[in-house]
Amino acid sequence: FPYTTLFRSDPFESNFCKFFLRNFNYLKLKRLICTSYSASPIVGQQLTLVGWDEEPIKRGNGYVMDISEIPMANGRGISDSDIDSLLKSKKSGVKRLKGDGDFRSDECIEYMKQADIVVTNPPFSLFREYVALLMKYDKKFLIIGNQNNITYKEIFPLIQENKIWLGCKYGDMAFRVPDYYKPRNTRYWEDENGQKWRSFGTICWYTNLDHQKRHEDLVLYKNYYGNEEDYPKYDNYDAINVNKVANIPKDYFECMAVPITYVDKHNPNQFEIINANDIRTNPDTPIKAHGLIKDKDAVITTQIYAKKRRKRLDTNSRSEEHTSELQSRRVI
């Protein structure tokens, strides 16, 4: 069934744009809409585009590309030169926006409303706002974000309610970067063609499109009973602590606090993600908007656990503050 796909991107040099143009027919798209933000530093760096008004694209106003047909050039898709020719033609579907292409503008929101699926890499600093718009207009989406977004008070409740989940790729991702990008000491390289690359270990896809990985059971090997000292209870929550996803016990069916990395492996048919506020055992423990076990309230003072922890520390200078820091990554 054909879809109308919207992606908000850097100008049409964006690999998001190129991917969907190349694969327009292969993906059986009905329509492709791309809104472009005028303040991007890569405007006009690779392609010189001409809008419907026959003026070259330049900074100031944003632009939109709205395409419903791409001629089959080489079977599956089209080449970069085909893309260049297409976008320079009067049939390119490119026109100037009234504003700068900010996704929060009325005209960009109107384009979002027309889309069946939204695919993009939103500004990380505006991730909350972008997701809020997607939810407001009930859009299917596939977007890139940081792993830390999981813990946002605006995001984690959506994950808990199975309104958002992670995509198939989680963690290490490599990205092409422009020629002007300055070399870095780590996670940076150039390939044999001189293309610059960077990789990031904290990037993932967020989506509400179902996929097979989401329904794969997490294989469990550990036992809780007989190893209770390895799973101490929290002082302020009715839950045991599990240090690693690999240590989730197969014979325990009550509440467990697990590392945030579990979310990538969550199968809603196998486990339920709950709100930590619902299992508070200390009435003085404040209600947390994000619903996680973290911060200073995520303490464990079980003597056996404290003894084992001290053995792993190099000195006795590590205090309860250190323990709280370790626990801050746990999630119900």
Which stretches of residues belong to each language-model region?
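Short, small-residue-biased leader/transition segments that mark boundaries at the very start
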Residues: P2-L6, E325-Q327
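Amphipathic alpha-helical repeat scaffolds
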Residues: I117-P123
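A short, conserved alpha-helix within the catalytic core of class I
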Residues: L126-L133
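Conserved beta-strand signature within the Rossmann-like core of class I S-adenosyl-L-methionine
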Residues: K139-Y152, K163, G167
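C-terminal lobe and adjacent flexible extensions of AdoMet/dcAdoMet transferase-like proteins
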Residues: E228-E320, S324, S328
